[in-house]
Amino acid sequence: MQKFILSAFVVALVAADCALKCPDGYFSFKRAPSAKNSMTGLWCVKAILSDTLISPNQAKQVCEKDGSILTSFENLDERTKLATVLRDFLSAKKLDRGGMIVDGHRLKNCETDDRTVLNAEPCRNSSTGFTTDEKHTDNTFMWKSWADTEPGQSIFEKQIESCLQLAISQFKSRTELINDVFCNYVKHPQNEGAYDLWNYGAVCGRLPEWN
């Protein structure tokens, strides 16, 4: 009996020592594994922010430099925690608005300036006209997290707003929510003073590692 108890104790110690763990600086988001998130039970997420504004197209590089990939949130708790990090960052800079890039973009056939296509299914539907690349996050909740009046479908020089940001806004109906933005521009090409469309970084994710 004593040998059994000792063996069980050793097994418990080994299991605890070999637990999956997220790197320092990353949130450890526990998720319900499902086919929609590739059976991911733990996903490590970090908002990587800096004083240098980025275009959405630069976001993947920001994550890659940290050994991660561009990601997003799966539920309200995750969204709130990420938004809080962004809000605190902006407050430290004495700013009351701004954003960071999250995974997500329009479907390829919806990246058009043809209003006939944009106003038809699936493009006109905010939950079917967009998709995500990262497969460890169920994006169902994200498509319910649009800021008021979004997605906006603004077009500039035949380019449509296709990438996504999570933003802090001075308006309650738009803060801590997602918005479609131009992928190629650091600032809005038609309104460079729209500070809520400035992006200071990206939301990055990675799988945990055995400790």
UniProtKB/Swiss-Prot annotation:
PANTHER family: C-TYPE LECTIN DOMAIN-CONTAINING PROTEIN 158, C-TYPE LECTIN DOMAIN-CONTAINING PROTEIN-RELATED-RELATED. Residues 1-16 form the signal peptide. It comes from the Eukaryota. The lineage of its organism: Eukaryota, Metazoa, Ecdysozoa, Nematoda, Chromadorea. Keywords: Signal. This is C-type lectin domain-containing protein 158. InterPro entries: C-type_lectin-like/link_sf (IPR016186), CTDL_fold (IPR016187). The gene is clec-158. Coiled coil: none annotated.
